[in-house]
Amino acid sequence: MNAKIIASLAFTSMFSLSTLLSPAHSEEQEKALNFGIISTESQQNLKLQWTPFLQDMEKKLGVKVNAFFAPDYAGIIQGMRFNKVDIAWYGNLSAMEAVDRANGQVFAQTVAADGSPGYWSVLIVNKDSPINNLNDLLAKRKDLTFGNGDPNSTSGFLVPGYYVFAKNNISASDFKRTVNAGHETNALAVANKQVDVATNNTENLDKLKTSAPEKLKELKVIWKSPLIPGDPIVWRKNLSETTKDKIYDFFMNYGKTPEEKAVLERLGWAPFRASSDLQLVPIRQLALFKEMQGVKSNKGLNEQDKLAKTTEIQAQLDDLDRLNNALSAMSSVSKAVQ
């Protein structure tokens, strides 16, 4: 991501808020909406969890709302890029890709059912495994099979990629064998002893309490990441303002009745809260930190090329730091006014 994109984030997010608060334009409302759902679990499980929510959304908006599934996260991003997906539930990393490459815009954020401001990436092994912590894993990695996450997954790929691999100067390729899959597939593979260790997250493990409780009993968590912000809900920027107003109103008011709360609980969430592209700033920093580590450890680059690339990455990190400082200052002023 270049500096111009970073610099425009604050303006874009503030502009989107003013747009939401302005009167609806006279554009024609979309007659149907496709809702993208990332492939964290089997399509069968996702349909069971999401159908009641999408039905409620359809009733409120007065238009058909179709579930849109794809075999991987990239399929949802590409669907939005080519106007086949109108709204989507993403992880933070896939949302970043949708914002940068698919004309997406964050407008809401999930909140965990217990009120937590986010969730955690984890590494799991079978309960019978002699691996009990990260040090054990790092020491024995060349003898282990590893279930990595989807390359566009925040908790399954980016976060462990930085905190487990980049910070310890190792690579996923160090394992005896590495495969990529979604959270549910990885969890079941560990439970069935098909892989030795895999990435996952606390939200998905909670869902296994219902979908596969016996398999959950076979798992052991050996590492837990720092907190990851709640998942973004993203729409296409070029949706009509009339449709955006209705979608925003639905999300900001959903979950107030016992029936709606039950629907959200099935998804592992409490009522949504407003958000913007700015929630992706920490994830952008993480991606850049990981990229920096990769450049520094790349033996195929000479020192001059390394310096040029790291200088460019550092400039982007500096831009993000300034943006964070500005946001903190704005937040302090807002609290003082209140």
Predicted regions and their residues:
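An extracytoplasmic/periplasmic, membrane-proximal ligand-sensing/linker region
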Residues: 30, 42, 48, 52, ...
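Bilobed "Venus flytrap"/periplasmic-binding protein-like clamshell domains
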Residues: 30-58, 70, 93, 116, ...
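Short helices/loops that flank or line small-molecule/ion binding pockets
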Residues: 74-88, 101, 119, 183-198
